[in-house]
């Protein structure tokens, strides 16, 4: 019996496979080619890692003509990845040091997610999603506006109400897209903060997720 359990742990025992699982948690499904490009892997290498995740039932796949698409096998797969990640941060000093160096300049905005939702509903907060637009359409926090990296320009900023607090999120606590967006907003005089939760973490807390372009 225990040997069967190791099929799951063995599939997770590779940084590329963990990254692929994290990327799949952001969207309903993605092609092997798309995942390979995002993870900086060759298509052949990405395909090999994805087959390992498939064998452990952490992901599912479908074929459409010459393309193969993958998706997470369920919320359990995402929770397992999050639990491994959070355990490593809690238990390994070297991981905590790496995380501390990466997030040293952050000023997280949320201790109370329910309070953030209320502020968004009252129009006090402008919420932005710094992930690629395809991930936004697949699922995003209610009230968020898609703002992929590189889309913050003078025309965009001129249309914003400077009296509103800006909150930006991306793929989760270790994604840096939101950090770059927050820095850009602050350079232009906005009060801007980083939300460390991503869509998978938001969903795990039991809050609703919106889909589509708005």
For the regions a language model picked out, list residue spans one by one.
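N-terminal helix-turn-helix DNA-binding core of bacterial DNA-binding proteins
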Residues: 3-42, 68-75
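Catalytic cysteine-centered active loop of the rhodanese-like fold, especially the PTP/DSP P-loop
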Residues: 33, 58, 160-203
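Positively charged, proline/Ser/Thr-rich regional signature most characteristic
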Residues: 109, 115-180, 212
């Amino acid at each position: 019996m225990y040997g069967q359990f190791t099929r799951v742990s063995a599939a997770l025992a590779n940084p590329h496979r963990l990254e692929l699982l994290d990327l799949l948690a952001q969207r309903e499904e993605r092609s092997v080619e798309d995942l390979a490009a995002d993870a900086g892997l060759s298509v052949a290498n990405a395909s090999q890692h994805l087959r390992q995740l498939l064998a452990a039932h952490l992901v599912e796949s479908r074929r459409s003509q010459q393309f193969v698409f993958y998706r997470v096998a369920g919320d359990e797969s995402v929770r397992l990845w999050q639990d491994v990640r959070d355990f490593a941060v809690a238990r390994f000093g070297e991981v905590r040091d790496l995380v501390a160096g990466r997030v040293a300049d952050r000023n997280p905005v949320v201790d109370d997610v329910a309070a953030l939702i209320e502020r968004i509903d009252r129009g006090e907060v402008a919420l932005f999603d710094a992930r690629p637009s395809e991930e936004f359409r697949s699922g995003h926090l209610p009230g968020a506006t898609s703002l992929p990296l590189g889309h913050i320009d003078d025309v965009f900023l001129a249309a914003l109400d400077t009296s509103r607090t800006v909150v930006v999120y991306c793929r989760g606590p270790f994604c840096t897209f939101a950090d770059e967006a927050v820095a850009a907003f602050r350079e232009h005089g906005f009060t801007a903060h980083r939300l460390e939760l991503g869509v998978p973490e938001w969903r795990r807390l039991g809050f609703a997720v919106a889909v589509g372009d708005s």
